[in-house]
Regions:
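N-terminal presequence-like segments and the immediate start of the first folded domain
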Residues: 1-85, 92-140
Length: 140
């Protein structure tokens, strides 16, 4: 499927951060045309149906749940992960960065969204290590 968006200066984090064990397809900018913009609330390691925590303190497992939630919400809106144009990643400990980004990379391989990462002092629940919000533009 052709990319519905124009992605500028694509790169892979294995090149930009060779000292880290990462493999994320990202880009510097995304231009969209038409379509519907889907703004995702920051997704956390909990069920979308009942807000129950997943009960893991492993950053990779938490990130899998966060990315599954993101994928599910985009699909419920009629899109796919290829329509993801931006993510903002919040982590509570810089030591979790590689695990979080490696796991996220499994979900965005070939997508190349723009990405911003922040280390924050805390998230809404003490057990949460990662939160990711996203923006998708789904073609009409």
């Amino acid at each position: 499927m052709a990319d519905p968006h124009t992605r500028y200066r694509k790169f892979n984090t294995s090149v930009t951060y060779p000292e880290q064990n990462l493999d994320n397809d990202l880009c510097q900018a995304v231009a969209t045309r038409g379509g519907r913009t889907l703004y995702l609330r920051g997704q956390c390691p909990q069920s979308l149906d009942d807000a129950q925590d997943i009960g893991s303190h492993d950053p990779a497992i938490q990130t899998h749940k966060v990315m599954q939630n993101i994928r599910q919400l985009i699909e419920e809106a009629g899109g796919g992960m290829e329509h993801l144009v931006k993510v903002v990643v919040y982590i509570t400990d810089v030591r979790h960065r590689e695990a979080v980004y490696r796991t996220m990379g499994d979900y965005i391989k070939g997508v190349h969204p723009v990405s911003t990462g922040l280390v924050v002092s805390a998230l809404a629940r003490p057990s949460w290590l990662v939160e990711i919000d996203g923006t998708a533009v789904i073609p009409d």
